[in-house]
Swiss-Prot record:
<comment type="subunit">
    <text>Part of the 50S ribosomal subunit; part of the 5S rRNA/L5/L18/L25 subcomplex. Contacts the 5S rRNA. Binds to the 5S rRNA independently of L5 and L18.</text>
</comment>
<keyword id="KW-0694">RNA-binding</keyword>
<dbReference type="GO" id="GO:0006412">
    <property type="term" value="P:translation"/>
</dbReference>
<dbReference type="Pfam" id="PF01386">
    <property type="entry name" value="Ribosomal_L25p"/>
</dbReference>
<dbReference type="InterPro" id="IPR020057">
    <property type="entry name" value="Ribosomal_bL25_b-dom"/>
</dbReference>
<dbReference type="InterPro" id="IPR011035">
    <property type="entry name" value="Ribosomal_bL25/Gln-tRNA_synth"/>
</dbReference>
<dbReference type="GO" id="GO:0008097">
    <property type="term" value="F:5S rRNA binding"/>
</dbReference>
<dbReference type="InterPro" id="IPR020056">
    <property type="entry name" value="Rbsml_bL25/Gln-tRNA_synth_N"/>
</dbReference>
<keyword id="KW-0687">Ribonucleoprotein</keyword>
<dbReference type="InterPro" id="IPR037121">
    <property type="entry name" value="Ribosomal_bL25_C"/>
</dbReference>
<dbReference type="GO" id="GO:0022625">
    <property type="term" value="C:cytosolic large ribosomal subunit"/>
</dbReference>
<dbReference type="InterPro" id="IPR029751">
    <property type="entry name" value="Ribosomal_L25_dom"/>
</dbReference>
<comment type="function">
    <text>This is one of the proteins that binds to the 5S RNA in the ribosome where it forms part of the central protuberance.</text>
</comment>
<dbReference type="InterPro" id="IPR020930">
    <property type="entry name" value="Ribosomal_uL5_bac-type"/>
</dbReference>
<dbReference type="InterPro" id="IPR001021">
    <property type="entry name" value="Ribosomal_bL25_long"/>
</dbReference>
<dbReference type="GO" id="GO:0003735">
    <property type="term" value="F:structural constituent of ribosome"/>
</dbReference>
<dbReference type="Pfam" id="PF14693">
    <property type="entry name" value="Ribosomal_TL5_C"/>
</dbReference>
């Protein structure tokens, strides 16, 4: 995904305020052994880009002054109550070094799960993104979590996710192996099932 930014020379609270008033958003580009670069982006274009999942989880081609560099979006600061992006941070990517980043999880086959269809189970998505490490060339836009066979009372953990070649969970996620999704039967559904079973077991009065 291509992103266009422009060099900026002024920094500080006053300069950033004037920039925002003119429809621009200040940002920085850092990392990969190069100097930190001050940039500005068109606010409306940035606002719409931030609505796309791919903008948050993919390597971006950032063009500044006619030169392109590969970056990851690392931080976004929003105004607390206005639809306004205050600042963005981009980190340069080194093609030869593994990067640590979070990618979104896409949950698949939930509607066709037998526990959902036959037992009224509810599948909760406990986390919606997970931290991985890989070379930039292997970075996936998202990871799929297959919920087709999860049974009521059971969970899917981080280590159950099928990872593409060259991708691994970061060390602390590997060690903790957190729950990603869990299937439970609501108390109301259990009570209804017990009541139905009790009704079936009653002997009709003579």
């Amino acid at each position: 995904m291509k992103v266009v930014a422009f060099e900026r020379s002024l920094q500080g609270t006053g300069a950033s305020r004037r920039l925002r008033n003119s429809g621009k958003t200040p940002g920085i580009v850092y990392g990969a052994g190069a100097e930190t670069q001050l940039v500005e982006l068109d606010h409306n274009a940035l606002w719409h880009a931030l609505k796309k999942e791919v903008f948050h989880s993919s390597i971006l081609d950032l063009e500044v002054a006619g030169k392109s560099q590969q970056v990851l979006l690392r931080d976004v600061q929003y105004h607390p109550f206005r639809q306004l992006v205050l600042h963005v941070d981009f980190q340069r990517v080194d093609a030869k070094k593994k990067l640590h980043t979070k990618v979104p999880l896409h949950f698949m086959n939930q509607e066709s799960n037998p526990a959902v269809k036959l037992s009224s189970a509810v599948i909760s998505h406990v986390i919606n993104e997970i931290e991985i490490e890989c070379l930039p060339s292997a970075l996936p836009e998202f990871l799929e979590v297959d919920l087709a066979t999860i049974e009521a009372g059971h969970s899917v953990h981080a280590k159950d996710i099928k990872l593409p070649a060259g991708v691994s969970l970061v060390a602390h996620v590997e060690a903790e192996n957190p729950v990603v999704a869990a299937a439970t039967i609501p108390a109301g559904a259990i009570a209804e099932g017990d009541a139905a079973a009790a009704g079936e077991g009653e002997t009709p009065a003579a």
